[in-house]
Amino acid sequence: MKKISITLLAILSVILVGCSGSDTYRGSWKATDSKGGKFEIFFDAKNFTVKNSSGKSEKYDYTQNSVEIENSVTTYGIQLGDGRGYQINFPNADNETLGLIKDENGNPIYTISRKDYIKYEDVYKL
């Protein structure tokens, strides 16, 4: 019985850790929307904050629900507490400091960079 309890506890721990966000996208990002609006996004393990250029912040709870790697391009799926889903996509296999946040239909919402505010076109520059 003791072995079963320890095994179940270990499995539960792995599941709970698996729901928190990846180290790849945790931390601060400079984000630009399709209209050129500038935002600061900060990802923590289980929530993220979006701050607009006037300083207004909104905080969202999320869980990471998928990781997909295709042709060395990594996409993380996250689901917000209210049920909405988003993808955090890093289209350049050798550069995880530039990316896109897309809605459930794959439409880009923000371009993200660790250093600068960038446009959509900048993500795909060679």
Describe the role of every protein-language-model region.
Residues I15-G18:
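C-terminal motif of bacterial Sec signal peptides marking the signal peptidase cleavage site
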